[in-house]
Each structure stands twice: as C-alpha cells, then as structure tokens.
C-alpha cells in the first residue's frame, strides 16, 4: 500500500480520487448496470474535473462527530488507531481507500476502522442487527482489498445521545466466508476495470 498523508476532503484529496475506485464508490461495481459508473470514472480521468457530491445535513453530522467517535473507539479498545488520508493499492493505482482509521501494531497496520455516526433510529437498528449493515458491506470489504496487512476491520456505529453509544462489529479476513468473498471481489474488480478500459479506448479512437 502507498499512504498519502493528505487531509480528507481537501482539494488535494479530491484530486487523488479522480478516476479511482474508492470505498464509498466501490458498490457501484456490483450494480446490475454499472455502465454509468464506467462513464463517471472515464469523465474524471479525461477532464480532471472534481465533482463534489452535495453535503447533506446527515453527512455534516457524520463529519463533525467522526473524531469524537474515533476517540471513543480508542478509549474502548485501547487500540493504536491512526487517521490516514488516502491509501493506494500497491499494484493498481486505480484502487484506493480513505480509511477512517488504521490500527497499528509494531508499526504495521493490522486492522481497519470504518465509522458511521447515524441517526439514533439507525444506530439502534445496527446494534440489533449485530452485523455490518448491507449498505456498508462493500465499503468494509474494500479495506481488505487495499491494505494487505490488515487482518480485521471494525465497523463502528456511534451515537452519544444514548447510553449504548458505541457499537463495534469485527470482520475477520480469515473467516472462510470473507476469504471466499474477497476472491470473488478480485475477479469483479479486474473485470470492471477491463470493461472501463475498453470503453475508454473506443471513446479515444
């Protein structure tokens, strides 16, 4: 992995994301029709335009609360959880992730942390569900695809408005179902990128 220590949501960070499959967008690969995502990435690659998604009130809440949630996570787990700006895959520079945190041991990342700060209703649903919510599965699994050394990813939901404010669910790389899923993802990622390159070549003919 290649770590770029840039501030998330800065101009430099947005520029690094251009034409790159990141954690927040990786789910588009698995849609029944992923062609719009193909064109989105090609447009970014060819134009260099930074298209910032509208920031909703819920997103602003999450951005503001994330540092508080990470501090709570550190206190609860005693983990050496470090904020990282942007991480690029060693072999494929079109794959990257902006982790909420990586957990280090002896100077090596051994785990990832994906934080959500949802509404109380959603937080309670996540606690009762006892697993990674379906809408965040691709994002969580993307950590394993980018950072080879991590052995687990903690999905964290944080809501300081209730007594059970922190929910942590750990996904292990060596879980047989996870290992099988990761093999499938490798094929799908490469298949998608081959498709994108074919579309781009046709456009540039």
Please describe what each predicted stretch is.
Residues 32, 59-67, 176-186:
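Generic detection of long, well-ordered alpha-helical segments
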Residues 195-205:
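Short, flexible loop/turn segments with low-complexity composition
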Residues 1, 28-29, 68-72, 153-159:
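Intrinsically disordered, low-complexity boundary segments flanking structured domains
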Residues 39, 70, 140:
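Generic structural marker for isolated residues within well-ordered, non-membrane alpha-helices
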Residues 77-99, 103-196:
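Nucleic-acid nuclease catalytic cores
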Residues 1-64, 205:
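Charged, glycine-rich intrinsically disordered N-terminal tails and low-complexity linkers that flank
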Residues 59-81:
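Acidic-basic catalytic patches of nuclease active cores, encompassing PD-(D/E)XK
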């Amino acid at each position: 992995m290649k770590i770029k220590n840039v501030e998330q949501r800065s101009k430099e960070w947005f520029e690094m994301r251009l034409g790159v499959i990141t954690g927040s967008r990786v789910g588009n690969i698995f849609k029944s029709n992923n062609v719009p995502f193909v064109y989105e990435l090609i447009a970014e690659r060819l134009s260099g335009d930074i298209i910032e998604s509208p920031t909703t009130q819920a997103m602003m809440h999450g951005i503001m609360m994330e540092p508080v949630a990470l501090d709570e996570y550190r206190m609860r787990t005693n983990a050496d959880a470090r904020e990282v700006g942007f991480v690029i895959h060693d072999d494929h520079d079109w794959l990257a992730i902006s982790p909420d945190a990586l957990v280090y041991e002896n100077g090596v990342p051994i785990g990832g942390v994906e934080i959500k700060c949802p509404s109380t209703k959603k937080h309670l649903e996540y606690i009762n569900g006892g697993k990674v919510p379906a809408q965040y599965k691709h994002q969580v699994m993307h950590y394993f695809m980018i950072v080879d050394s991590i052995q687990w990813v903690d999905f964290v939901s944080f809501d300081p408005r209730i007594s059970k404010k922190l929910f942590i669910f750990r996904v292990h790389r060596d879980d047989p179902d996870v290992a099988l899923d990761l093999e499938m993802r490798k094929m799908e990622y490469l298949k998608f990128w081959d498709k994108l390159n074919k579309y781009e070549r046709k456009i540039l003919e």
